[in-house]
Each structure stands twice: as structure tokens, then as C-alpha cells.
Amino acid sequence: MSNNKETPEHLQAQNIIVIHPGSLYLRMGRASDVNPCRLLHAIGRRRKPGGRAYRDRVLSVPIAKPKESLSEFEECRLQVSHTLQSCVQSDGRRRYATPPQQISAFNRRSGAETVQASRVDWKDDLPGDKVFGEEVLWLNPAGEFNVHYPIRRGELNLHKDVGGSMSGVMCDLQDIWEYVLRHRLRIDLKQLKQYKAVLVISDIYNRAHLKELTSLLLNKIGFGCCFLVQDHVSATFGAGLGYACVVDVGDQKTSISCVEDGISHPNTRVRLPYGGADITQTFHWMLQKCSFPYKECDQSRPQDAFLLKQLKEDICHVNLDVCGAQEKTFAVHQPQQEKRRFTLQIGDEAIVAPLGLFHTELLSVTGVNKSTPMTQKPSRAQPHPEDCFDAEYLRETGRRGKENLEQTANESGMANAENADEDMVVEGLEQDREGKVNEKDFILPGGQMIGIDQAVLQSIERCPNDELKRKMYGCILVVGGGMKFTGISNWLQNRVALKIPLMYRSEHNIVTSSKDIDAEITAWKGAAIMSCLESAAELWLTEAEWTRYGLRILREKAVFMW
């Protein structure tokens, strides 16, 4: 009996590297791997003598909370709490809640218990000028290292401070990715010409950024060839679905689009600038309101930020059968301090915080509730001087061609019948064929951003025909690591089901993790599957093609509408 690991397909998959970069984590692995390597998507760089200090934070800086925001937050929190109290458990009994005063009194009495453990120190004595992975979290804030996260809120982290230029961000990405290739995947970088790369990109993309990323893979890191695939398209492959309304909740953004037969419809795409990290900060705010026993917790410290993230993942849920106060223990081990254990009591705050995805007033702690959503810019709004087939180039050359043609016709005295055709071409290009998607459609009166359930409805309503809308209402795929709360998929299903137009109602189903794949790696797994298909042979873009043709070849070979 032959060994499956020796088949040509498996050998080919071993030479394909699938890269899924996120705002918090990077997932990278061979297409033949069951699971990818997961690494903190950050880098520590030793400052040059006299250089400016700069550190990206794990959690965004909380905004100064004016009275209006606090009252808005508190009003929404009370409204959600009353809604939960009016719900019933699965056995038909009414839910009950422990009074907040009782929970606060317990937490105020809860003291720290010292635990015997080995001492933890700052990692200031690391060799070299670069630090990767979890060690970045243990760099002394007063030390010699700057900390950079190259992706924030799903976009390249471009800013005007240290390391915020395009070249700086590309250098960070190159160093992090090459570190994983060398030290996690054990690949000799000199042999990379024998390897292919698949890069999972955001469903809403910037064409100039894609050019830089393709150059990074082929020219700088040195892969033999590559192709790019949108995360929502690869998620449907990973879940084994031919179509779905994909809801991807990451650490710092939530993106939604409708995918059918490997195509993400541009008009249905929207990215909301909130995710799991915003839920973490909302949860911390609620913990403070009920006398969180770890009083010196500071979101700006990486260790405390990850502690809060872990508490959110361990405690938060949307299980209506869990009522009253729950006791949880957690440990705190700061550098150069003793390890301490705390006991925490918490009530419905564990449910209210995740529901911030539906009631964005609860996210006012970070200010994202008043941010502007992002939709896909049409190609005419993203002209590039190297792309001789984009709308801007054709518009300009078409106009010049028309002027030259008119001049020739006038000189010869001939009636130019071709001018009518030329006019049609130019005017057709000047129209926005992709339709207009207004970001304001995702903002409620008063500037409040809509919740995830309303965003799903808005996205599906932008589908081009009724049949596609009906299919999307029947298949909503939830992926990403920011919405992994028990029971939240049922909550989303119920919220959406109440608002589905009668003509589209059918058997309603939300797929959370099809084929037993973790929602966090569904998109990565789908890209790995795509790369091994026979049809993928036409997608690969070689370094020679890229160097010769540039953006033209990406336009021709891209698996998405350029």
C-alpha cells in the first residue's frame, strides 16, 4: 500500500507556502500542513543611538470619554441587560441576574494570593537587533527596542512616525516572514526559487498595496512564483461551500461580502473597523465597573492586554442558560514581580460585552462606533501609472485618440463616422460600471455605526439579483478569531432572521466552522486547498513575468476582479 505522503500531489503541496497575515497574528505554513504556524505579527527593532522611541500597542488607545459617550454607553448597557433579563432559558424558565452591587462587593473583598513561581524578567539582553514572536511582548518599555505591528485594522500600518513609511512596513513584513520561513518552517532562503507562495489578502484591497506585496514575495523574499487570493473567497473553499455571505471577525476589523463560485461581489463588500480587540476593551471597562480585583491592570502594557484578551476568551459567552454570578480565577505574572492569583465574580457582563458587535454604542470606549466603514473603491478611483489598462489610462488615451482622429478628419474633409464609436468608448469608461456603494449606508442617524447583523443585511441587499439574495440569506459563514463566543452564532441567526424580507425566507443556516476546521484558520486552509487544484496552474505568476509586465500580468492572472 503506497504512502500518501509520497504522492506527487503531496510533494507539490510541500513546496507551496500559504501566508495569511493579520493585524495581530501571522499564519503561515505549507499547503500540506494540517495547521499553519501562528506567530505574533510584530517585530522589535533596536533603536539607533539617539533614535526616537516608538511602540505600537496591542490594544488601541482608549479615547477620552466625554459625558455624552459615557451616558450613551451606560444607556445601551442597561438596555441590553434588560433585554437579557426578559429572555428565557432553554427549559422555558426566565433568566435571573445577580445584583451588580453584590458582585462589586465580592470583588472588592477579593485579595491577591501569592503563588510560588520562577522569576520572570524583561528580555532586554537578547542578541541581535531584531526580536520576533512572543518575545516582543517581554521587551522593556524603557529599553532600547521599538515595536512595530505592520498591519492595523486590516490595512498596512502606514503613519508619519518612526517606521510608518511604505518601505518601513515592507521591511517589517519581509523580516517577520523570512524569520518564520527559516526558524519555523526550516526552509533555506537560498532555495526559495523552488517554492511557490499563496498570499491571502483582504477582500477590500488597495491596488498599490497589492503591487508592493507582490514585489515583496517575488523580488525581495525570492519565491519562484505566487498568486493572491481574497480571504472571503478562500474561506468558502475552506468551508467547502460554493456560495456564502462571509462574515470575517478578526482582532481589529469585521469584513462582510457575498461570495459565489469563487467571486466576491464588489458592491457587497464592507469593512467595519471593530473586532475582537474592541470587545476586549469594552469587557475591561465593564470589569472596572464591577470592581475588578486586579486594580493596576493597564491596557497599554502588552502583558495586561493579553491577560484581558485571555479573560475575554475564557469568560465571555452568549449562553442564555448561564445565569447569576460566576466565579473565575486568573493569574498575573508581571516581569520582576511575584506571581499572583485573583478570584473574580462576574454576572451578565460576560454576555453584554460580546453583544457590542450588535450594539456598537458599547464600543464607544475605543471610539470605533463613530468611525467610517470602508467599501471597495472602484477601479477608476485607484489609477496606477504602471497599469496601462486601468480606466484612467484608457480615458486619457481615448480622449487623445479622439482629438487626433477629429483633426485628421477635418484635414481630409471626410465625415468621420468612427467618432461616434470613439465617443461611446470614452463615455462608457467614464461611467461607474461597478455601481455606487455609499459608506454612509452603514452609519445610523447621529453618526453611530451599524451592528454586524444590520451590516449583513446591507451587504446581501446589494447582491445583483433576487436569486442570489435568497441564496445568501440561507448561508452565512462566520470565520475569524474575534467572534468565538459560545452561542453568538445563534444570536446572529435570530437577529438576521427577524429582518429577512418575506420573499427571501427559507431554511436559514449559519455555518460557523464547517468540516471541523477552526474558524481562525478557515481562510488559510481554503487557500491551501485552492493552491493544489489543477486549475491553479494558470494562476501562478512568476518572477520573470512580474519583472517584465508588472501590474498588467497581475490584472490578467488575478483570481478577483481587478
Swiss-Prot record:
One of its GO terms (biological process) is chromatin remodeling. Keywords: ATP-binding, DNA damage, DNA recombination, DNA repair, Nucleotide-binding, Nucleus, Transcription, Transcription regulation. One of its GO terms (molecular function) is ATP binding. It is found in: Nucleus. Belongs to the actin family. ARP8 subfamily. ATP binds at residues 248-251. This is Actin-related protein 8. InterPro entries: Actin, ATPase_NBD. It comes from Aedes aegypti. Component of the chromatin remodeling Ino80 complex. Exists as monomers and dimers, but the dimer is most probably the biologically relevant form required for stable interactions with histones that exploits the twofold symmetry of the nucleosome core.
